[in-house]
Amino acid sequence: MSCGVPDRQEGGHISANFNKWWLLPLGILTASALTALNILVFGPSFIQQTASNPSPIDCSGPKANDFSCYQKRYEDLVYNSGVEAAFADLKDQFAKEQFVKASCHQLTHSIGRAAAELYGGDVPSTYSQGDDFCGSGYYHGAMQTVVANIGADKILEEADNICAAPREEQDQSLDHRNCAHGMGHGFMGLYGNEVFESLEACGALSEGWEREQCSGGVFMENVIDEDNPSNPSKYLKADEPFYPCTEVKTEYKSPCYVRQTNYMLKKQGEDFAKVFELCGKVEDDFRPICYVGLGNNAATQSTKNGTTDGDQADSIRGVCMLGQETEARSKCFVGAVRQLIFNYDNDVQAKALCESLTPTAARAGCLQVSEEYMAERRR
């Protein structure tokens, strides 16, 4: 395969497809690196603050690929040294350890959960200490603790108030999005991974935009928990690859399909070409978002396949060019660009991908996606 975008070039059609799909809501994002990189992480461990050894746990050697070791390491760092110290250590390990790089989003969930415990479940206090590193997982994890602390008896009457502070500060800002998305994760924990009950809880939110973001957290958690031995997902079916997306309300279908590709890839042995074909069978209005989901997964996989920006760009191009239609390829690149920015909280890797594309129209369209998405994240 050539370094450029299409051998199957169709004039300016790729650019035309790029021009609209940067408008996808920020909350419509990948199901994260967990399943794609075979890192299985299950429910949060809401560990109370303890007087543990202030020196971080050593997760090297035989524990170098032990998620529970790193989880405890960062929880202890939060309790003993603070959130800033935990992130400083995580960023250092991210640069050195491939396992940490691959599981970074869920490790930031752990930091967020511990921070919310430390700050008594107060959203403004917890968020004031936050960091967007590795896909804003800190804020999602924080909301898992907040929802758990409120409890099932009061959560529906309190749901609209949970994200009041970030909503009032700037409606639909990144903090507001992370709060609403995190509620979805929290509801799944509260209701024992019951997808439809958790979606009903999202439905208790007054704003349609918040409901959509919340549902994204629900679907992300559903995919993650497929192999959870203590509480496996009941809402994934190997013989119905699009379920539960086919059964949810229309307002929740896009957040579902964009994450469902992660599960579909696993069931197809990480064969992207086969999943491109499956996405082509999705109900018409949601076929494009399925391709965007594949782009998210392509970007996630690239962190495993390459260590340099150029390697990542090559890996993503190789995947997205498996799409047989212009729409499939262009939406895949859109998803990849957004996921790279989402993960790294900058546009360096995304721009490297865009600059590798040909023809010029495709490169320009890709750069527009990157520019607009960066602006959206900075609101």
Model region roles, listed by residue range:
Residues 1-18:
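N-terminal Lys/Arg-rich, disordered targeting/topogenic segments
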